[in-house]
Amino acid sequence: MEANTRSTGRLPAAFLTPGSSSFMDFLGEHQPEMLPGNRQLPPVQGVIEAPHGTTIVAVTFPGGVVLAGDRRATMGNMIAQRDIEKVFPADEYSAVGIAGTAGLAVEMVKLFQLELEHFEKVEGAQLSLEGKANRLSTMIRSNLGMAMQGLAVVPLFAGYDVDRGRGRIFSYDVTGGRSEERHFATTGSGSVFARGAMKKLFRDDLTEEQATTLVVQALYDAADDDSATGGPDVARRIYPIITVITEDGFRRLGEDEAAELAGSVLQARLEQPDGPRAALL
């Protein structure tokens, strides 16, 4: 049958048989060995050294949500990559920022993108934002075996909810547990420092421009205290990846926009190295 379909150019029957709208279910039925959760690693001694993505931040504003990430990947105490991309569109109205084991995280994002695309093609409509968040939770849970060996993936998921007319943020733990964050969220090695900055600077009435400035300030503070987080690198023209999701869909700021935004933050830091100060009362 396989040889016949190859010679005729026809798709195998499995591709033409009605079934689940989940691409993961399809793989699980026909090619289960391709699912990340079905891989078995040999027993290892100690920690597996692999590049890790670090800090991701997200913040809502009245018109949508901003998701951003630094560009550094580390392997132990070494900088493995200076310009890694950690923020990806999931579909037209959502995005994923990755922290944890970089290779597995990027693979999970690609599978997630396929999952959403497959559902839309089969059902003729997009999943709700909550449904997308639940699908990602299932994928993270399937990686638990890898996480137990030190290869964890802990992303942030953000998107514009077209039904509710606002931006939403979902955070996860290593077991796939999902929580919706009210205003802002962080993940990765510099998350505690970034969260502290966002907690002091967040306001309910942020404009889109202020929200993008806030995430750069938060990433700068994270890089200031966490060696695994990379700040803006003017010499190499490496700047944070900043994405905005509104009712118009997903948009990534261009390099010139990111450079201008990072430049304004760096210029202000010459006067106030510790960043903007929040009012005491």
Curated annotation (Swiss-Prot):
Keyword Hydrolase assigned: yes
Active site: 54
Keywords per UniProt: Autocatalytic cleavage, Cytoplasm, Hydrolase, Protease, Proteasome, Threonine protease, Zymogen
GO BP term, pick one: proteasomal protein catabolic process
Influence of temperature on activity: Optimum temperature is 55 degrees Celsius.
GO molecular function: threonine-type endopeptidase activity
GO CC annotation: cytoplasm; proteasome core complex, beta-subunit complex
Family matches, as Gene3D superfamilies: Glutamine Phosphoribosylpyrophosphate, subunit 1, domain 1
Subcellular location: Cytoplasm
Catalytic activity of the protein: Cleavage of peptide bonds with very broad specificity
Function: Component of the proteasome core, a large protease complex with broad specificity involved in protein degradation. The S.coelicolor proteasome is able to cleave oligopeptides after hydrophobic residues, but not after basic or acidic residues, thus displaying chymotrypsin-like activity but not trypsin-like activity.
Record protein name field: Proteasome subunit beta
The organism of origin for this protein: Streptomyces coelicolor (strain ATCC BAA-471 / A3(2) / M145)
Biological classification of the source: Bacteria, Bacillati, Actinomycetota, Actinomycetes, Kitasatosporales
